[in-house]
Amino acid sequence: MSSKKKQKMKRSSSTQVQALAQHISMSAHKARRVVDQIRGRSYAETLMLLELMPYRASYPIFKLVYSAAANASHNKSFNEADSFISKAEVNGGTIVKKFKPRAKGRSYPIKRPTCHITIVLKDRSKKKTDQDMFLGTKNV
């Protein structure tokens, strides 16, 4: 990724990994259309869906999901087959404003929206409920 597009990984708990892509050059509304389709799905199903979707927003989201899974397997020893998208959100970023020259010395403003995409992966095999922790049983 270029220096403008940053990717971060945050550690929040032992069963989830968060990946963040910032300043992606597309409208948040168009990216939300794709993110709404993958929320709650398994990792393998998500990759298959994103490869087949005809939207321009699916490629950066595909790269982010793939990177989050690689970070999860490397840093937290998650099995990618057991991972699923627990949270996926798109927030609006800054708007890049340009001016296009027009006839007779006029200019026309152009607004290029950006967005920030957050993907949270959870591991089903390491998921424990409060009751299981209290009773000491293992959730399979």
From Swiss-Prot:
Keywords: Chloroplast, Plastid, Ribonucleoprotein, Ribosomal protein, RNA-binding, rRNA-binding
Compartment(s) of residence: Plastid, Chloroplast
One of the protein's GO biological processes: translation
Domain of life (superkingdom): Eukaryota
UniProt xrefs under CDD domains: Ribosomal_L22 (cd00336)
Record GO cellular component, one term: chloroplast
Molecular-function GO term, any one: rRNA binding
InterPro entries: Ribosomal_uL22, Ribosomal_uL22_bac/chlpt-type, Ribosomal_uL22_bac/org-type, Ribosomal_uL22_CS, Ribosomal_uL22_sf
Signal peptide per UniProt: none
Family per similarity comment: Belongs to the universal ribosomal protein uL22 family.
Role description: This protein binds specifically to 23S rRNA.
The protein's assembly and partners: Part of the 50S ribosomal subunit.
Protein name stated in the entry: Large ribosomal subunit protein uL22c
